[in-house]
UniProtKB/Swiss-Prot annotation:
Annotated signal sequence range: 1-16
Glycosylation (residues): N190
Main location: secreted
Organism: Pyricularia oryzae (strain 70-15 / ATCC MYA-4617 / FGSC 8958) (Rice blast fungus)
Protein name, entry field: Cutinase CUT1
Length: 228
């Protein structure tokens, strides 16, 4: 019965935008930030590597490879700070952000985890001197924690910070990413967001990370990058 209740809750809310975005009227530079698909790392030239690379995994039901909520909020703030000196990359196929993988033991599919790992590896091989930061929202947090925890030390060292919104394995992982420094991890979990406390019940609080993804999280990532 609990599974059915959770499944129905997920289905009912899947079509809703996970977070209402709150961005300024886009300038010429910021226009690209509103795109739900970002492949700067994949398409970028190694001879023109930026100082910063953001890798993000969207929530279940979100479009593109970035979504149009937490991912674009974080990207917009970082691009305002670093202007043309940052690449933004979403985690795409085979991560399709479907609902059912939330019920898997890892909280997502192995294919999704492997694709995120491929992005971190690509950043390390293509732009080894860039500061890499990452983030995930809802199911995207499961994609990120699994990928980051499985990366070799050299790749983990390049990752300066990871932000997680509505962390679906927050309780199970005790508010951290296993085998990754706690000082490089920042978890944003609203007090009434049930997914942060060992369930998959979606309450309104799960969709209320606009301020965190627009201000608190990018500011923390900027500090992490500057301190590296």
């Amino acid at each position: 019965m609990q599974f059915i209740t959770v499944a129905l809750t997920l289905i009912a809310l899947a079509s809703a935008s996970p977070i209402a975005t709150n961005v300024e009227k886009p300038s010429e530079l910021e226009a690209r930030q509103l795109n739900s698909v970002r492949n700067d790392l994949i398409s970028g030239n190694a001879a023109a590597c930026p100082s910063v690379i953001l890798i993000f995994a969207r929530a279940s039901g979100e479009v593109g490879n970035m979504g149009l909520s937490a991912g674009t909020n974080v990207a917009s703030a970082l691009e305002r700070e670093f202007r043309n000196d940052i690449w933004v990359q979403g985690v795409g196929d085979p991560y399709d952000a479907a609902l059912s993988p939330n019920f898997l033991p890892a909280g997502t599919t192995q294919g999704a985890i492997d694709e995120a790992k491929r992005m971190f590896t690509l950043a390390n091989t293509k732009c080894p001197n860039a500061a890499v930061v990452a983030g995930g929202y809802s199911q995207g947090t499961a994609v990120m924690f699994n990928a980051v925890s499985e990366m070799p030390a050299a790749v983990q060292d390049q990752i300066k910070g990871v932000v997680l919104f509505g962390y679906t394995k927050n309780l199970q992982n005790r508010g951290r990413i296993p085998d990754f420094p706690t000082e490089k991890t920042e978890v944003y979990c609203n007090a009434s967001d049930a997914v942060c406390f060992g369930t998959l019940f979606l309450l309104p609080a799960h969709f209320l990370y606009t301020t965190e993804s627009s201000i608190a999280a990018p500011n923390w990532l900027i500090r992490q990058i500057r301190a590296a």
